[in-house]
Every structure is written in C-alpha cells, then in structure tokens.
C-alpha cells in the first residue's frame, strides 16, 4: 500500500538513523513529529539520499495513531515522520466538509503531477469537476469510496485534513499512552519544540 515509505522507515531504523533523534515538533491534540537529525525540522533525507514520491490509497488515512510522512509539498518525503495524536471524533457536519476537502486535495494532486504540456488542460478539467461538485454535490461513487474512512474518523478521530497530502505507512497498535504523554509536554509557543528534549532511544525492527 505504501511500499517505498515502509522501505525508507525500516531501512533507516536498521542503520540506527533515528536513535537519539528528538521529536522536534509537538502539538497536543494534533501530532508529534520527528525523524530530523538536525532537530530543526529542516533536515534529514531518505535511504536513497534525497526525497521520494507520495503514496496514497483510500484505505490508509490519518486516523489517531497513524504513522505518516512529513513533507513540504508533493513528492518531498525525506526522513521526517509524525504520529497522529488527535483523538477527537468528527461529526456529521465535519464529515461533509472533509469529504469535499479530500476531493479538492485529490484534484490538486492531479494538477501538481501533470506534465508541463498538459498542465493547462488538467487544470481546466479539475476546475470543471470542482465546479460541478460545488453545484450538485459529490458523486455517489466518491461518497461510497469515502464512507469507510468517515466512519472510522467518527469512531477514533484523527487529522482528516491531511489525507491525500501526507503518506500514511503505519499505525500505532499499542502504546498510544506514550504518544499522548509526549504530546502533553511543555513546548516553545514559537516553534512547538519541547522545552526539554524528548528523544527516540532506538527503533527495533522485528523481521
């Protein structure tokens, strides 16, 4: 579902890349972010020496506990990742807004990935689809596609606004109390960096 992201994470973990790296950005009721050896939020690279492409599938979402790639735009994944800590279930009204936002995010992705000689045509096509959705509502096909994710967000919460923007490649299955504890530490209001370092001791990979 997200093979390159999984390969990157396991590959770096096996080398000890993440050992001692701090969580440099922590926002309660949102997420905790790490993976940057410089601790600034501006460093890090993948096992391939640069960035790698996004990987999105309908079944992988930013639910509470999701392990996702941090990035600075399309196909800019390096070494940084975050764990979704938000656990506020979405409401029916939220769901309507998020389903529309997911559609916008997907259309924007089509625009971003369009070859230069097709960019204008793709932009116009995306704008036409968007205008249609604004006037007539989302298609039943899209609503059916989104329904499992909507139901899950209603149950466990998460950050649905990040779907189709950040690659999800893992899920915390136990130990969310540790994530919650990290999210609750005091931070600098300017950059959300913990006032006292919170670091990864090591990441163990079980083959």
Region locations from a protein language model:
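Cyclophilin-like peptidyl-prolyl cis-trans isomerases
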Residues: 1-207
């Amino acid at each position: 579902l997200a093979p390159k992201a999984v390969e990157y994470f396991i590959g770096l973990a096996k080398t000890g890349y993440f050992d001692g790296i701090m969580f440099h950005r922590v926002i309660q009721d949102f997420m905790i972010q790490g993976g940057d050896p410089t601790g600034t939020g501006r460093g890090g690279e993948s096992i391939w020496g640069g960035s790698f492409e996004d990987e999105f599938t309908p079944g992988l979402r930013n639910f509470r506990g999701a392990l996702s790639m941090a990035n600075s735009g399309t196909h800019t994944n390096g070494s940084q990742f975050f764990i979704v800590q938000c656990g506020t279930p979405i409401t029916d009204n939220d769901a309507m807004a998020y389903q529309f936002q997911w559609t916008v995010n997907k259309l924007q992705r089509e625009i971003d990935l369009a070859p230069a000689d097709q960019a204008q045509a793709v932009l116009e096509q995306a704008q036409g689809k968007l205008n249609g959705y604004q006037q007539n509502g989302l298609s039943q096909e899209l609503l059916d596609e989104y329904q499992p994710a909507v139901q899950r967000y209603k149950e466990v919460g998460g950050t649905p606004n990040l779907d189709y923007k950040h690659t999800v490649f893992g899920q915390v299955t136990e130990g969310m109390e540790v994530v919650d504890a990290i999210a609750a530490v005091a931070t600098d209001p300017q950059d959300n960096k913990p006032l006292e370092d919170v670091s990864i001791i090591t990441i163990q990979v079980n083959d």
